[in-house]
C-alpha cells in the first residue's frame, strides 16, 4: 500500500505523485486527512484509492469551462475536471472530490469527477460542484456542435461503461450528473443547490445510447435541497435516448411537479425513458408528472435491482 500525507509521514505528499509511482497492479493508495489542491489523472486499471475520512480527505481544484487558457481558447466542459479517470476497474472510497469554481451562471461547467471507464466504483464519497459535477462517460456518439467534446476522451471508443455509486453524497445545480454510462446509484444523497432561479436546476442529463439496457438507476436514494418547492427537475435528456429511473427514492418538495423536462425536444418523448416506482416524499406526485414520465409496475421495477444491473 502507498500512503499519501501532507505532513510528510507517508510515501508521498501529492496524490498525483503517488498515482504516477504505481508500477505493479493491482495497487491501493491510502490518503490521510488533508486538503489536496491538485488535479488527479487515473490512467492505470485495478487501482484503489481510499481516504482516511470522507469529509476530511479532500481533493479540490477550481478549473472551469469559461476560463481562457494559455492557447487563447476557453477551457470548455471536458477539460475542467478535478479528477479524471480513463481506466477500467477503478475504486474510490471515503473521499471528498470537489470543484470549487462556483455557480455555473458565473463560470460555466466545472467538473469534480470525469469518470470514463468500465467497472468504476465510488463508495462513501462526497462529490461536490455546481454545474456538471459528475460526468459518467463515455461521451455521446455525436457532438451537437464542432469542438464541443474537446478534452481527454473526445476521440476515444464509444463503449459501454458500467459504474456504481454507493452511499455517496453528490451536490450540484444544473445537469450535475450527466453522460452515457450505465450507472447505478444506491443509497446516495443528491443535493440540489439553490441558484435563485426557476428552474433552479436539473439533477440528471443522461445521454444513454440507443438499445442500451440501463442508463441511470437511483435506488433507495434521497433527493434533498435548499431550493424552494417545485423548482428542480429530476432530469432532462442530453440525448434523445437518455434514461433515468428512480426506485423507492425520497423526493423532497423542491422537485418539480412534472418530474422531468424534455429539454424542448418533443421527439424525445418517444425515445427517452424517465420512470419512477414506489417513491415517496413531498416531491412525489405521480398524478402531476409529465405525460412522458412512466410509473413502473412491480414486475417492471424488478428489472432495476443491483443484481440485475450487474448481470447485464
Predicted regions and their residues:
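Sequence-level preference for short, compositionally simple segments enriched
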Residues: 1-312
Amino acid at each position: 500500500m502507498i500512503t499519501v500525507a501532507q505532513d510528510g509521514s507517508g510515501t508521498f505528499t501529492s496524490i498525483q505523485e503517488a498515482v504516477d509511482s504505481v508500477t505493479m497492479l493491482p495497487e491501493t493508495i491510502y490518503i490521510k486527512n488533508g486538503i489536496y489542491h491538485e488535479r488527479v489523472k487515473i490512467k492505470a486499471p485495478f487501482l484503489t484509492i481510499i481516504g482516511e475520512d470522507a469529509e476530511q480527505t479532500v481533493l479540490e481544484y477550481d478549473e472551469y469551462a469559461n476560463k481562457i487558457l494559455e492557447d487563447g481558447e476557453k477551457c470548455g466542459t471536458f477539460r475542467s475536471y478535478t479528477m479524471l479517470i480513463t481506466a477500467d476497474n477503478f475504486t474510490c472510497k471515503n473521499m471528498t472530490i470537489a470543484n470549487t469554481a462556483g455557480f455555473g451562471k458565473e463560470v460555466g461547467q466545472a467538473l469534480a469527477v470525469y469518470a470514463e471507464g468500465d467497472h468504476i466504483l465510488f463508495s462513501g464519497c462526497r462529490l461536490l460542484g455546481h454545474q456538471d459535477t459528475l460526468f459518467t462517460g463515455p461521451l455521446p456518439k455525436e457532438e451537437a456542435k464542432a469542438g464541443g467534446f474537446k478534452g481527454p476522451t473526445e476521440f476515444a471508443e464509444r463503449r459501454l461503461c458500467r459504474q456504481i455509486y454507493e452511499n455517496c453524497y453528490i451536490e450540484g445545480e444544473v445537469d450535475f450528473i450527466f453522460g452515457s454510462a450505465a450507472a447505478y446509484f444506491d443509497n446516495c444523497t443528491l443535493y440540489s443547490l439553490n441558484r435563485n432561479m426557476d428552474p433552479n436546476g436539473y439533477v440528471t442529463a443522461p445521454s444513454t445510447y440507443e438499445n442500451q439496457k440501463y442508463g441511470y438507476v437511483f435506488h433507495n436514494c434521497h433527493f434533498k435541497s435548499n431550493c424552494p418547492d417545485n423548482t428542480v427537475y429530476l432530469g432532462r435528456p442530453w440525448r434523445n435516448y437518455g434514461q433515468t429511473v428512480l426506485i423507492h427514492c425520497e423526493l423532497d418538495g423542491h422537485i418539480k411537479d412534472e418530474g422531468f423536462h424534455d429539454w424542448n425536444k418533443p421527439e424525445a418523448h418517444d425515445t427517452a425513458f424517465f420512470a419512477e416506482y414506489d417513491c415517496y416524499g413531498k416531491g412525489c406526485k405521480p398524478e402531476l408528472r409529465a405525460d412522458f414520465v412512466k410509473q413502473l409496475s412491480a414486475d417492471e421495477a424488478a428489472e432495476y435491482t443491483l443484481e440485475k444491473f450487474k448481470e447485464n
